[in-house]
UniProtKB/Swiss-Prot annotation:
It is found in: Periplasm. This is Tol-Pal system protein TolB. InterPro entries: 6-blade_b-propeller_TolB-like (IPR011042), PD40 (IPR011659), Tol-Pal_TolB (IPR014167), TolB_N (IPR007195). Residues 1-21 form the signal peptide. Gene3D superfamilies: TolB, C-terminal domain (2.120.10.30), TolB, N-terminal domain (3.40.50.10070). Part of the Tol-Pal system, which plays a role in outer membrane invagination during cell division and is important for maintaining outer membrane integrity. Belongs to the TolB family. The Tol-Pal system is composed of five core proteins: the inner membrane proteins TolA, TolQ and TolR, the periplasmic protein TolB and the outer membrane protein Pal. They form a network linking the inner and outer membranes and the peptidoglycan layer.
Length: 439
């Protein structure tokens, strides 16, 4: 679905953005008090029925999604609905600043939902500094009714980016492994959903075990490992068509795949003669190229965002540790030297950090600089693992396994380690992979 800036919103008001004010959220050291923000329901100039509901109801639903997104970031404290004013369509561009000042809000989001003659919707999004009585930014989105949630996520992204200075991440998807059944006989299916758990659907039927799904940069392709005929093999799945194909037709076990940043290459591990090494192959298939040659197990490769380097895990030193090498396999260097073992490394899309699972008295998710310095543990569950980065590199999704039951759930945490929250899924979930920002 392509989004475009609306060309006629409240008499072209969206094209007259004022100069930026100074209201902002500082997220560099964590937030003691989230910013109070008001997000009233979005009015409509004329109630019209759409396949997704009438525009009046959609206005409230859009506001609810924006509220949920910003609240979940941990940086904002949306006012309760009981403290909100009912906004009329003319008030969208003329806020009642006196009311909102008395409400305690520092920032205000107002907008509208309008049905267009071609069957599309226009969703307008405006951000105001309440104390300075200034408009900070505005944008409009033209979408099909079925895509109204994406317009809401885009609005939340607009506000988040303007007030934090960080990149957006709400308009994105997650692919993961949905699990059900007893822990000794789990049924595992690929599933995909919006980052907030909405629009959930299953991609595979559970007849084979699937693990470690990873998005391609084009967001329409997933690579993953599947046990077929009792053999681990790497596949590629097309989300649009539902088709899947084998990446490498080898008699050996292949697993832990991941796309390169340009989507042209898949890096994976292959077990040959009792030794496991990292290989790369064209995403379209072909002859694999071996990148590591050390004794032991080398696996869990993850590219740097510029594609020049790869972080991976290896037990070549006697314990499971993290290493970084050039994308062609040269210049391999260990970067983890703390107590315990390290695995499931993931390079931040910002390029500045590496997330990992640390094993030592438990499983915990942490981050470090790309040279291994500045290690910081973010979680303290019984078994937390499998970190995956948000598109802006500020939030990490992982899965947490409960002691005893084997029940696994998806969670997210920010880089401060303070804002930890569960991610809703209809069944148990593991191996999350956060996809790029949608176009």
């Amino acid at each position: 679905m392509r989004f475009r800036l609306a060309l006629s919103l409240l008499s072209l008001a969206l094209f007259a953005a004022p100069a930026a004010a100074q209201l902002e959220v500082d997220i560099t050291g964590g937030i003691a008090q989230p910013m109070p923000i008001a997000i009233p329901g979005m009015p409509t100039p004329a109630v019209a029925n759409t396949p997704a509901g009438d525009t009046a109801a959609l206005g409230q639903r859009v506001a609810d999604v924006v509220t949920n997104d910003l609240k979940n970031s941990g940086l904002f404290s949306p006012l309760p609905k009981s403290a909100l004013q009912t906004v009329t369509h003319p008030q969208v561009t003329a806020p009642d600043y006196m009311f909102w000042t008395q409400s305690g809000a520092q920032a205000l989001i107002q907008g509208f939902v309008q049905a267009n003659g071609d069957g599309s919707l226009t969703v307008g999004c405006y951000l105001y500094d309440v104390l300075a009585r200034t408009e900070l930014t505005r944008q409009g989105f033209v979408v099909q009714p079925a895509q109204w949630r994406r317009a809401a996520h885009k609005c939340a992204d607009l506000v988040y980016t303007r007030l934090t200075g960080e990149g957006p991440y709400f308009d994105s998807r997650v692919v993961y492994v949905s699990e059900t059944g007893p822990k000794t006989n789990r049924i595992k299916r690929l599933a995909i959903m919006d980052q907030d758990g909405a629009n959930h659907r299953f991609l595979t039927n559970g007849q084979t075990i699937v693990l470690t799904p990873r998005f391609a940069p084009n967001q329409q392709t997933i690579t993953y490992m599947s046990y077929t005929n009792n053999r681990a093999r790497v596949y590629v799945y097309d989300i649009g068509s539902g088709s899947q194909r084998l990446v490498v037709d080898q008699p050996n076990m292949t697993f832990a795949p991941r796309f390169s940043p340009d989507g042209r290459t898949i890096v994976f591990s292959m077990a040959v003669g009792g030794n496991t090494d990292i290989y790369r192959v064209s995403a379209g298939g072909g002859t694999p190229q071996r990148l590591t040659t050390s004794p032991g197990i080398d696996t869990g490769a993850s590219y740097s965002p510029d594609g020049s380097k790869i972080v991976f895990e290896s037990d070549r030193s006697g314990t499971q540790q993290l290493y970084v090498m050039n994308a062609d396999g040269s210049n391999q260097n260990r970067i983890s030297f703390g107590s315990g073992r390290y695995g499931s490394a993931a390079w931040s899309p910002r390029g500045d950090l590496i997330a990992f699972t640390k094993i030592g008295g438990g499983f915990n998710v942490g981050i470090m600089n790309i040279d291994g310095s500045g290690e910081k543990i973010l979680t303290n569950g019984w078994q937390d693992e499998g970190p995956s980065w948000s598109p802006n590199g500020r939030v990490i999704m992982f899965f947490r396994t409960a002691q005893g039951s084997g029940k696994a759930d998806l969670w997210s945490v920010d880089l401060t380690g303070v804002n930890e929250r569960p991610v809703p899924t209809p069944l148990d979930g593991s191996d999350p992979a956060w996809g790029p920002l949608l176009p």
